[in-house]
């Protein structure tokens, strides 16, 4: 890999900014100042910027995060902290979430630097299922299951929701599996049923389940088997 490309990918600098930094003698490769952006480097080289070691961040990052309440899934937000604060730089700048969660929703978020892979999760044509544990303000009523299975017309929408699966756990808790990602869909579905969501936790995307060994704010790499479920 070219040195200027490495700097751009691992520091957040643009390629032109990386070359300016090189001309300022701010970069060393294996202890020697290097000004040539075209210089080839590999993972065996020790590269430093202004004396600080720059780790290699390999392509092909696939992670699951246990998102806590109170965090947004965007890189920047003026009101709330972002989930990218849980990742070290420069990894945080390379990742994007494959589907977001609202600020007050907890649970599974998949993150990657592979746009094609995440597209298989977020694109409506792939009908990726997501399962949520939903806590309701009022008791569950028996007709909810049929209403979800048949689809319902949400306020402001012209087409009904696609069939969804509702599993009743107890009087106030259900698992809801949907294959769409409409704006605030889960909350709006239960509002249409005359109820209110007071707790929302996503625990499954496709075949990938949130690892119960993770605490809120923790993440781990996906296994090869988990990654492959969205490569089919």
Curated annotation (Swiss-Prot):
Gene: rsuA
E.C. designation(s): 5.4.99.19
Pfam families assigned to the protein according to its UniProt record, in alphabetical order: PseudoU_synth_2, S4
GO molecular function, one term: 16S rRNA pseudouridine(516) synthase activity
Job of this protein: Responsible for synthesis of pseudouridine from uracil-516 in 16S ribosomal RNA.
Record GO biological process: enzyme-directed rRNA pseudouridine synthesis
Naturally occurring in which organism (per UniProt): Pasteurella multocida (strain Pm70)
Family the entry assigns: Belongs to the pseudouridine synthase RsuA family.
Keyword line: Isomerase, RNA-binding, rRNA processing
Catalyzed reaction equations: uridine(516) in 16S rRNA = pseudouridine(516) in 16S rRNA
Protein name: Ribosomal small subunit pseudouridine synthase A
């Amino acid at each position: 890999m070219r040195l200027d490309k490495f700097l751009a990918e691992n520091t957040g600098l643009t390629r032109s900014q990386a070359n300016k930094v090189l001309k300022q003698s701010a970069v060393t490769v294996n202890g020697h100042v290097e000004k040539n952006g075209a210089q080839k480097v590999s993972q065996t080289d020790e590269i430093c910027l202004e004396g600080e070691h720059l780790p290699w961040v390999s392509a092909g990052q696939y992670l699951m995060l246990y998102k806590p309440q109170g965090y947004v899934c965007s890189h920047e937000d003026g009101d709330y902290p972002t989930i990218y604060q849980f990742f070290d730089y420069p990894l945080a700048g390379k990742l994007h979430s494959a589907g977001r969660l609202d600020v007050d929703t907890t649970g599974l978020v998949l993150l990657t630097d592979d746009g094609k892979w995440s597209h298989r999760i977020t694109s409506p044509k792939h009908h990726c299922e997501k399962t949520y544990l939903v806590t309701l303000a009022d008791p569950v009523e028996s007709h909810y299951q049929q209403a979800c299975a048949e689809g319902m017309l949400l306020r402001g929408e012209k087409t009904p929701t696609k069939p969804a699966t509702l599993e009743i756990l107890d009087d106030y808790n259900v698992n809801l599996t949907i294959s769409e990602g409409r704006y605030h869909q889960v909350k709006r579905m239960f509002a249409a049923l005359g109820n209110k969501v007071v707790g929302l936790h996503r625990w499954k995307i496709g075949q990938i389940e949130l690892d119960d060994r993770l605490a809120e704010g923790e993440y781990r790499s996906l296994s090869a088997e988990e990654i492959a479920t969205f490569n089919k």
